[in-house]
Each structure stands twice: as structure tokens, then as C-alpha cells.
Amino acid sequence: MATLRDIRRRIRSVESTQKITRAMKLVAAAKLRRAQERIVAARPYAGKMAELLGNLVSSAGAHDEAPHPLLVQRAGPRRQVVIITADRGLAGAFNSNIVRRARDFIRQSSAPDVTLVVVGRKGRDFFRRRGFTIKRDMLGFWDRLAYGHAAEIADFLMRQYLDAEVDEVHLIYNEFRSVAVQRPVLEQLLPIPRAEAGEGRATTVDYLYEPSPEAILGDLLPRHVRTQVFRALMESLAGEYGARMTAMEAATKNAKEMIEVLTIQYNKARQEKITKELLDIVGGAEALKQGAEA
């Protein structure tokens, strides 16, 4: 049975852990608010760009005519997967869900040659240990995430695609739904999907473009790819903070419950010790009394 000293030590240890989890929850909540604000601010821009892209593709000609190399559909087997995870843990199933989704996609892929671009230390370490081919990784920028980081990743992916080193590029990340819900998402990034590029989309306004739609596409399509990568990074960052906030809230609650249980154990053990000491005193007094009478 645990001694009073052991129970006190455990209570102090759990209280110390509770302080840490509570602080981590507060930090994650503050960062989550800022991340949510960035997502809300970015959505109108991304939506308008998608609308303009659809009109431009329609104006430049049928999609099958491939008005830009980033729209070219190739039948090759080389596939690249961009996997976005966090650098740190303590975020519930945030990283494991992405890793599981990526492994399932790779297993089900008919492409014999699959290479990875991994964002985040957790994903990099996991796939490196299992011998996957990692073309590139990016780590240590999450606390200062900027558009430049997304542009660096997107430009690397576009170079790979335009140089015909890969035939498809897919993106796997956690989409932020709410503080408690992050959904693993798989999207095709390159070639830009037909629906995303506006095929079949009704054009309600007939725009006149200067310069030509083809010339504008040459600038807009790379911007679109960079924007999609940046959006995925922001979604993942907000999801990480939400998952960590939820996990730390649960850990803080569990610590509180454990402290209550340990406190009850401590009080019972202390009461038993006091009762035993009283019985010893009473027993000793009785023995002395009987000795005196004899």
C-alpha cells in the first residue's frame, strides 16, 4: 500500500502536470483565434481567384486544348504526395490521422513510383523510418507561417511537374472544421483538376481580357497553386491548435479528477494512520493501567 509520502508526491506531480496542460491550452486557444482570422480573411481571395480562373480557362479555349502546361493531363505512373503534419505532438490524433490517410492512399495507388514531400517533423520522421522516398521536407516554420513558405513549396512542386519528373501531385492535410473537428483531406493539386479550372461552369459575365486570357493564365495559374498550398497550410495550422487545445483541455480535466482521487486516498490513509496511532496509545495506556493495578 502506498505511504502518505508516496501519495503526496504523486499529487504534487499531477498538479505540476496540470499547470503545464492548462498553460498549453491557453496558448493554443490564443494562437487558434489568430489562425482562424487568417483563414476567414483568405477565403474571399481564394474564392474570387477560382472564379476568375474558371472564366479565363473558358475564354482561352476548351480544357482539352491545354491553354497552359499546368492543365495538361498526363497518363504517366509517377505520383507525388504532399503530406502536411505538425512539428510537435500533444495534439490528440491530429498527426496520426494524416499519416494513416497518407499510407492508405499510397497503398491503394496504382502508381508504382510514389515520392513524398513532407511538411512537419512528425510526418518526416514517420515516413523516413519506414523507408519512403522523401524528395523534400520543410520543418520549423509553423510559428511564423507566411505566404513565402507556401510559395517555396508550390514552386518546387510546379518545377517537378513542368519538368515531367512527376505526372500527378496530391495534397493531404487536416481541414479545420471546428475546435474539436479536423478532417483529413486529399486533393489533387497538379494537374489542376477540370472542375477547379472551371470546366462545365456557367459563365454569366463575358469579360474582355487585356492582355489575352492565355497570357493572364500564365501568371494566374502559378498564383492559384501557391494559394491552394497556403490555404492548406493555414487550415492545418488552425487544426493543430484546435486539436492541441482540445487534448490539453481533456488532459487538464483528467488531472483534476486524478488529484481528487489521490486526495481521497491520502485522507483515508492519513485517517487510518491516526486511528492506528490512537489505538496504540489507548492500548499502551491500558497496559500501563493494568500493570499499576497488579
Question: Language-model features: where?
Answer:
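C-terminal beta-strand-loop-alpha-helix "lid" module of Rossmann-like NAD(P)-dependent dehydrogenases
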Residues: 1-294
